[in-house]
Amino acid sequence: LRPAVIRPKGK
């Protein structure tokens, strides 16, 4: 899983 998945920008 990519690190971006841990902090999703899509609220």
From Swiss-Prot:
Instruction: Determine if Secreted is one of this entry's keywords.
Output: yes
Where is it found, in Gene Ontology cellular component terms? extracellular region
Which tissues is this protein detected in according to the database? Expressed by the skin glands.
* Cell location: Secreted
Q: Which domain of life is it from?
A: Eukaryota
Keywords attached to this entry: Amidation, Secreted
Query: Where is the PTM Lysine amide found along the chain?
Result: 11
Family membership noted in the UniProt record: Belongs to the frog skin active peptide (FSAP) family. Hyposin subfamily.
Q: What is this protein called?
A: Hyposin-H1
Tell me the organism.
Answer: Pithecopus azureus (Orange-legged monkey tree frog)
